[in-house]
């Protein structure tokens, strides 16, 4: 790692329980400042969620690493991301798997994320402007689904787009939110509460 700030961040993540070396390497390789406004760049390697406009945020690096680690990704895992946002989480995923599918309900965020990913020579991502509650059915089923905004309850449509043996990680709740891991075992879904979190809400529909 040639970026001392990234190196310090990765050390912080490891000390705080992130064990997957490939996830840590991906975090180190993605320049978080590229996904922030000029005014926020000085905080790029702090472990904080930061505003990206449109009432949305870029998640804190610990949460990005934790959610990614929980998915137990393999190189050939087919991944769906709900909520492209800045594209930072998308970029981390793209370094770990062959292809990422990502849905964003706010058109301007989708286009900004596409531009940033292209600038970083990340081309193994397909993005779509649409309603995240609906997933991306014609590209599924998926081995892993990651939701980057909090739903009041688990969207049943997303469960149906999960492969047998697949994993989904998402925040659930309104005022008090929990990070939930769900694993599909044939027609059953086994869920586990991971920890308390704080995300922006997952809103149905899409915006121009």
Swiss-Prot record:
GO terms for biological process: methylation; protein modification process; protein repair. Its main location: cytoplasm. It is an enzyme of class 2 (transferase). Its EC number is 2.1.1.77. InterPro entries: PCMT, SAM-dependent_MTases_sf. The active site is at residue 59. The keyword Acetylation does not apply. HAMAP family: PIMT. This is Protein-L-isoaspartate O-methyltransferase. It comes from Vibrio vulnificus (strain YJ016). The lineage of its organism: Bacteria, Pseudomonadati, Pseudomonadota, Gammaproteobacteria, Vibrionales. The gene is pcm.
């Amino acid at each position: 790692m040639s970026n001392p700030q990234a190196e310090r961040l990765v050390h912080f993540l490891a000390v705080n329980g992130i064990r997957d070396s490939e996830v840590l390497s991906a975090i180190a390789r993605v320049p978080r400042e590229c996904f922030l406004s000029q005014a926020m760049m000085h905080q790029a390697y702090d472990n904080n969620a930061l505003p990206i406009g449109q009432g949305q945020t870029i998640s804190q690096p610990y949460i990005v690493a934790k959610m990614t680690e929980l998915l137990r990704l393999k190189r050939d895992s087919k991944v769906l991301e709900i909520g492209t946002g800045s594209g930072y989480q998308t970029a981390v995923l793209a370094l770990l798997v062959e292809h990422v599918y990502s849905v964003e309900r706010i058109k301007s965020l989708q286009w900004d994320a596409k531009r940033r990913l292209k600038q970083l020579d990340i081309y193994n991502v397909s993005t779509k402007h649409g309603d995240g509650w609906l997933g991306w059915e014609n590209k599924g089923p998926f081995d892993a689904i990651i939701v980057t905004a909090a739903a009041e309850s688990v969207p049943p449509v997303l469960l149906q787009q999960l492969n047998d043996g697949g994993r989904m990680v998402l925040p659930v709740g309104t005022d008090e939110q929990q990070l939930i891991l769900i694993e599909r075992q044939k027609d059953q879904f086994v869920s586990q509460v991971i920890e308390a979190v704080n995300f922006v809400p997952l809103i149905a529909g899409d915006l121009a």
